[in-house]
From Swiss-Prot:
UniProt similarity note: Belongs to the universal ribosomal protein uL1 family.
Organism phylogeny: Archaea, Thermoproteota, Thermoprotei, Thermoproteales, Thermoproteaceae
Matches recorded under PROSITE patterns: RIBOSOMAL_L1
Keywords from the UniProt entry: Repressor, Ribonucleoprotein, Ribosomal protein, RNA-binding, rRNA-binding, Translation regulation, tRNA-binding
Organism: Pyrobaculum calidifontis (strain DSM 21063 / JCM 11548 / VA1)
The protein's name in its UniProt record: Large ribosomal subunit protein uL1
GO molecular function: rRNA binding; structural constituent of ribosome; tRNA binding
A GO CC term attached to the entry: large ribosomal subunit
tRNA-binding among keywords: yes
């Protein structure tokens, strides 16, 4: 990625964003906003929904497992924050309020393949549009490894507008840590949409601070 992005130039912009705005009484997040151009989002192949693992996540995600049988035991041993059983899923049927609450309560979900038809019927209409459908864990995959990865990921989505918004840090983190997080996101994005061709602007901002605009010419290597 260093061949595409000038690290030092981007690091200066991160430092500028961290110093901007007033002090707040809470720990502000640092957000990355990427604006793309020349992408026809009416074509399904141009919409993306990626999970990118951050080298220095600002917080660890909360993970819940839809589970039963051996998978339930594996999920508990992997240290998930909650287990929702088959019976509990069946009890959610038709209860949109409870399903919405569940979707907000956890960052990511996992499930075994055999539960997916039930989950598709019960939670799919609400979880699907929110990008919260469970990650399917095949029988031969170590559940703990999946959970540990999901603790550190952010979701990168491109759907109706050519704009991506991702939390890449928080106040108190070193600028270099936030830089490596941003580079991880940009690297994945560059694989799908080469930045030299499709990047319009980058913005970095804290939760309550004005964004720092970064033009492609300022950070893309020549």
């Amino acid at each position: 990625m260093s061949a595409v992005v000038q690290r030092e130039a981007l690091l200066k912009k991160i430092d500028e964003a961290l110093k901007s705005g007033k002090k707040r009484r809470f720990r502000q997040s640092v957000e990355l906003i990427v604006v793309l151009r020349g992408i026809d989002l009416s074509k399904p192949e141009n919409r993306i929904n990626l999970l990118v693992e951050l080298p220095h996540p600002p917080k660890l995600n909360k993970i819940a497992a839809f589970a039963h049988g051996a998978f339930e035991t594996q999920a508990k041993n992997a240290g998930v924050d909650a287990v929702i059983t088959r019976q509990e899923v069946e009890g959610l049927a038709g209860n949109k309020r409870a399903i919405r609450k569940l979707a907000k309560q956890y960052d990511f979900f996992i499930a075994p393949p055999d539960l997916m038809p039930l989950l598709g019927r019960v939670i799919g209409p609400i979880f699907g549009p929110r990008g919260k459908m469970p990650e399917v864990v095949p029988p031969n995959v170590d559940v703990k490894t999946v959970v540990e990865r999901l603790r550190r990921v952010v979701r990168v989505r491109l759907r109706n507008e050519p704009v991506i918004k991702v939390r890449v840090g928080a106040e108190g983190q070193k600028p270099e840590e936030i830089l490596t997080n941003i580079l991880a996101v940009l690297e994945e994005l560059n694989r799908k949409f080469p930045l030299r061709q499709y990047l319009r602007d980058i913005y970095i901002k804290k939760t309550m601070s004005p964004p720092v605009r970064i033009k492609p010419a300022e950070v893309l290597a020549r």
